Amino acid sequence: LKWRYATKKMNGTKVPQEKIDYILEATRLSPSSSGLQPYKVLVISDKALLEKIKDIAWNQNQVIDCSHLLVFVAWDKYTNERVSEVFNYTMDQRGLPHSNMDDYKANILSIYEPLGQEWHAHHASKQSYIAFAMAIAAAAEQKVDTTPMEGFLNEKLDELLQLEGTGYKSTLLLPLGYREDENDWLVNMKKVRTPK
């Protein structure tokens, strides 16, 4: 983590697929509230699509200079169907009956449902931030540079990626690539954090 920084200029070199897979696996293993993992990660490397995303992301060049762009998208709401699907899969993997989760599921839904869809979307979005942080740490472990991004127009990106009707909304962008030392003003700056 001392090595990583928010890379300002990437050189376009491709990140090997095994490193991309490692980073994605870190997002999959990320903790989430009640283990629901209410998000997924889209991987984009098509240059024409990245050009369109750059326009939506306030013309940040890392979007087109990166090797792969990770787009984090989160559930727009918690539903019985979604929660059941995750819990049923979990029980199947553990060789246990689905009914083992019935009381817990009912409790979650009784708490979440009255809070409304805006709360649901916000809560799911926060879970994607945890996975986002795991991806950044995993990338640093692999010596892959990243630029964490919230700076983009979510609704326009959702439209471009045709997320309407899928139950997902975009939350974060994470370009992956390699720094271009000679053209990155931040690369040699001292890393500074507030004191302990």
Where are the language model's segments positioned?
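Glycine/small-residue-rich phosphate/adenosyl-binding loop
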Residues: 42-126
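Short helix-capping/linker segments at secondary-structure and domain boundaries
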Residues: 78, 139-145, 181-183
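Short alpha-helical functional segments enriched in proximate histidine and acidic residues
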Residues: 30, 34, 52, 138
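C-terminal helix-cap and adjacent tail motif
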Residues: 1, 6-7, 169-196
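A generic alpha-helix structural signal
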Residues: 20-24, 53-57, 161
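A glycine-rich helix N-cap at a beta->alpha junction
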Residues: 62-76, 163-183
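Small-aliphatic-rich amphipathic alpha-helix that forms the alpha element of a beta-alpha
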Residues: 23-29, 70, 106-160
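An N-terminal domain-cap segment
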Residues: 3-37
